[in-house]
Amino acid sequence: MEETLNNRIKTKIRRGKIYPLGFSRQDEWMQFTAIFPGQQEVKLQLWEKGEKITEIKLNGAYQIGDLYSVQIPATKKKVYYTYEVGGKQIADPCAKKLFTWRDTEKKVLLSTEIDEFDWEQEKRPELLFKEMIIYRLHIRGFTKHSASNVKHKGTFAGLCEKIPYLKELGINTILLMPCYEFEDYYMIPAADPRFSKKKGTIVKNYWGYGGACWYFAPKQCFSANKKSPETEFRSMIKEMHKNNIEVLMEFSFNSNINPYFIIDCFRYWAEEYHIDGFYINDGVTMIDMIAKDPVLADRKLLARYWDQTRIFGKKERFDLDDSKNALENQNDQRCLADYHDRFLKTARCFLKGDGGQTREFASVFRENSEHVAQINYITDNNGFTLADLVSYNEKHNEENGEDGYDGTKENYSWNCGQEGKTKKRMVLRLRERQMKNAMVMLFFSQGVPMLYAGDEFGNSQNGNNNAYCQDNKIGWVSWDQKARNEVFFEFVKKLIVIRKQMAVFQNAHRLYGQDYLACGSPDISWHGIKAWYPDFTAESRLLGVLLSGRYARGKDNRSIYIVFNMNWEDASIGFPRPDRGQCWKLLMDTAKTEAFVQERQNKEEKKEYYMKARSIAVFVSATTIDTMDRTSNLSYKHDKEQKAASKEIAEQPRKK
């Protein structure tokens, strides 16, 4: 049909298709398709050089339910468009690319097509969950600090400059906080009684969890190339994949969002940007539909909780034959992972010496599943950093201007005797030990470990546990801390090396505490003051964990014995008898000045180990004729990638 669109232009328009959403080209036509729930008047507006030239009312002929779609003849000119919904001008929720200009002080968002991109011979790493070391970061905050030593600070390109650092640390997966387009500022409602200083005021949306979002477009201000952020984003993905690093994206959807919209969104990012997986925030309904989407079958999907009964038809339980099959079949075909804070809360409480936590910690330590992986983390953006976790009892969010109402009150933290910054050596030494203890808990548990950016060298937010609006040194990773905490950084690197090397940490199934191989020992066992007799009473803060190498399937199948003393007093813990012809050799003790020890004395004759207060010791099995070199090399041996990355960093010129 032919319609008069305004007083100046006549053109042919026709009803569009219901798919794809957003702007697309259909042969010689341009299609505009969007979803706007509710009975509202919807108009499509076309713009040229900041001036509105065309307006099309979409209600009626171009409407199917809440979906609106129209096609107009294609043009070689750049097409800018917006929608007017209920009298309010908004950008296409499915826009693939956004621009801005100011018109009478009002921000108008416009969208168009994305540029072509040459992926060359790029190949996704396709890591198994059991192999993953996840690193959660904020694109801008990760490299924005002046000491980050990158040229393109706070951008996708800047993150690429940190690839050698990620490889040196041992990271093979990064989880990006929201980096799609979102409003940079939003207003706190004046009627909200929780806020006294910011009633009706505008705050910085640094994290991207509030305000309007455009889930199909990379965030323009996170790109050094403002004209083509999608090209810079894809270049970043290509470089990550070239270095065998997977990229996962976090999405924060409204609770009432249509699950089909989420599927379309994830399919788009998987196809156009080669994203390896997605983390879906809380509150999304019918999430199981996403897990069953065939297009996303080879992508990793993280969510707070997956209903295994609905997805797989049964709950996991102990079965002798199933356990043997899971042990022998270590391909790890899992694509789903639970992402919740159970490990965080339990590990923090156990770390600071709360009573009644030993049994619960033993449970989260071994938590794993044949069908759904478990993401373990002890810190993330929603709470204290690792350094602040051992430095503050209370949150200090004064800079947020909300009179302390914001941020969680349950931090499960302990300041080690002094609130905040201090020069007391005893306090500082205890804090460092507690940080080491936390990292051992994280990397030696059975789930998939996730490290929060900067924790590996003691990054601090000065006690702020909710830096959602702190686009400054409070919310950024402070790279100047790395030089001051080099010893702790090296400690974390060694833990990651051990995690990757030893097969007992790379199980793709649950450990049941059963001897289903009839080999004389269960896959995992618990111990106390006396071997084989764990104390799970409320007063106990002592626990030994034996991971049997007989159930491991890998190049290094040695057993590991980890002993935790989270009490404020020294204690002795029993030794389980090693396998015939083997002995226990001390690998590390967080109470020692040099945590990774070069001890040549074995523990073959000893029945117990004396532990300092608030410390963790790790023992590795070795044959009685083994030299100590093999054991000590376990903690100091770095793979080729890490060595090459360290050399590359050392040779880099310092950038301003």
Model-derived features: positions:
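Conserved, mostly hydrophobic/aromatic
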Residues: 34, 83, 137, 166, ...
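Aromatic- and acidic-residue-enriched carbohydrate-binding clefts of CAZyme catalytic domains
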Residues: 148-155, 186-242, 246, 253-272, ...
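C-terminal accessory region downstream of the catalytic core in glycan-modifying enzymes
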Residues: 495, 568-601
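Carboxylate/His-rich catalytic cores and anion/metal-binding grooves
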Residues: 167-203, 383, 391-395
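C-terminal beta-strand-rich structural cap/linker in extracellular carbohydrate-active enzymes
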Residues: 36, 77-80, 600-639, 643, ...
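Carbohydrate-binding surface patches
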Residues: 30-33, 37-40, 526-576
